Amino acid sequence: MLYDLFKLLAYSYKIIFSTETIERLLQVIPHNELYSSPIKGLFLRHSDQPFCYEDIIQEPSICIVLSGEREVQLGEQCYRFDNQHFMFCPVNIPMRGEIKCAEPQKPFLVMSMKIDIESVSKILLANPNLVDDVQQGD
């Protein structure tokens, strides 16, 4: 089932971003909105207040919460992501979410990088040994 796939791919991973780096980002990105960076497919979302989002389609992406916590609901399952757990979404998937705690002194900040499935497919087709390595567990 797709939810099980998401669960398997939502790896726990300690992501370390220095407080200094986050403070610099907060000085240059717009507050309380989604910022599309000059790097194609890289987005930053800032909020200093709680908010919910419903009935969205999450595109293939990797999302790293730099500050705060994000709660995502997929069907009956609920997943929490923070600066020690990132979200990997390999396919388009309907979901809803909530940012419960965010304030000016402790804003929510997430960095999201879209995955270009077509480019990944081309890389895998051009390098079949990559697929073989994964299948063999290398």
Identify the function of each model-found stretch:
Residues 1-38, 51-52:
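A short, N-terminal "cap"/entry segment at the start of jelly-roll beta-barrel domains
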Residues 35-134:
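N-terminal regulatory/effector-sensing and dimerization cores
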